């Protein structure tokens, strides 16, 4: 084991300890003297921080997926995540699938690969998209028919990621539906697209 690994582990541990300490400090604050407008501004800040957490989880989940076999984990990755974090298996599976899409990936020869929905991943890292908004964009991307070219896919995903910073999830879902109708005017899917189109 190299000393670099120990230093990295120490830095990671210290960063998480600092995050814990910062949250403890904020949780101990009193907010009684604030105006409603100030409280809403702080709630907006809380939401942005909450939205950034998955960007920390994605590389951890993807690393476990690469490094540990189901035998080592005692089952599926989603089950191991559920047991470790005490969340439901359904939520763990959602996080594993989202991490596979939005987290950093590694190619066969070890080279880093950017997330497929790059704009969505970047907006999530900045705390600009909620998990619900991310789910809308991921669903849209997965349901696009195979005949739509990559440049159009990327442009559509970028547009939805940008609009997701301005609209609530249900509004974004309506926009995604309209965009899907524009891209697939006839609603035609090839045979291989049918499972994706069905959801």
Where are these regions (language model features)?
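Conserved C-terminal region and hinge/linker of Rieske [2Fe-2S] proteins, especially
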Residues: 1-199
């Amino acid at each position: 084991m190299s000393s670099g690994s120990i230093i990295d582990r120490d830095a990671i541990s210290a960063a998480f300890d600092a995050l814990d300490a910062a949250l403890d400090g904020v949780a101990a604050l009193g907010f009684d003297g604030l105006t409603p407008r100030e409280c809403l501004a702080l709630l907006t800040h809380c939401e942005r921080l909450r939205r950034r957490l998955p960007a920390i989880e994605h590389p951890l989940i993807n690393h476990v997926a690469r490094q540990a076999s189901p035998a080592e984990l005692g089952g599926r990755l989603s089950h191991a995540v559920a047991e470790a974090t005490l969340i439901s298996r359904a939520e763990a599976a959602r996080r594993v699938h989202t991490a596979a899409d939005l987290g950093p990936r590694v190619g066969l020869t070890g080279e880093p690969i950017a997330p497929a929905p790059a704009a969505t991943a970047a907006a999530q890292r900045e705390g600009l998209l909620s998990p619900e908004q991310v789910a809308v964009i991921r669903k849209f991307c997965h349901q696009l028919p195979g005949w739509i070219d990559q440049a159009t896919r990327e442009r559509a995903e970028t547009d939805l990621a940008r609009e997701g910073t301005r609209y609530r999830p249900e509004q974004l879902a309506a926009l995604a539906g309209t965009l899907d109708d524009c891209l697939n005017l006839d609603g035609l899917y090839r045979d291989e697209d049918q499972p994706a189109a069905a959801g």
